[in-house]
Amino acid sequence: MTAPETPAAQHAEPAIAVERIRTALLGYRIMAWTTGLWLIALCYEIVVRYVVKVDNPPTWIGVVHGWVYFTYLLLTLNLAVKVRWPLGKTAGVLLAGTIPLLGIVVEHFQTKEIKARFGL
């Protein structure tokens, strides 16, 4: 027969879960801002290339933005799993990273909601 868990062991599990949520939230917040800023840089590159018609505009901005957005997707999915977002909300937050500045606005409201929900 197993011994009942001590009160300290019962409270250790939620503390670990909250720390994992805090870590996932920090990664999401950093990547939401980074993705938003690189998306603005990508818009700048598109304007320079197709509107201003500058010879040899920077092409590396699109590559960097693609990798930054991929990292944003991974970290957002990590957070979504930890806080148990429904599929529709997860898709909405993921797609918010494709519109300039919307990802940053969504990050603000999601952070506020998660901090209130988990007492961070």
Swiss-Prot record:
Keyword Signal appears in the UniProt entry: no
GO cellular component, one term: plasma membrane
Assigned protein family: To M.leprae ML1176.
Membrane topology term: Multi-pass membrane protein
Species classification: Bacteria, Bacillati, Actinomycetota, Actinomycetes, Mycobacteriales
Name of the protein this chain belongs to: Uncharacterized protein Rv1342c
NCBIfam families: integ_memb_HG (TIGR03954)
Species the sequence originates in: Mycobacterium tuberculosis (strain ATCC 25618 / H37Rv)
Localization (cell): Cell membrane
Keywords: Acetylation, Cell membrane, Membrane, Transmembrane, Transmembrane helix
Residues bearing the modification N-acetylthreonine: 2
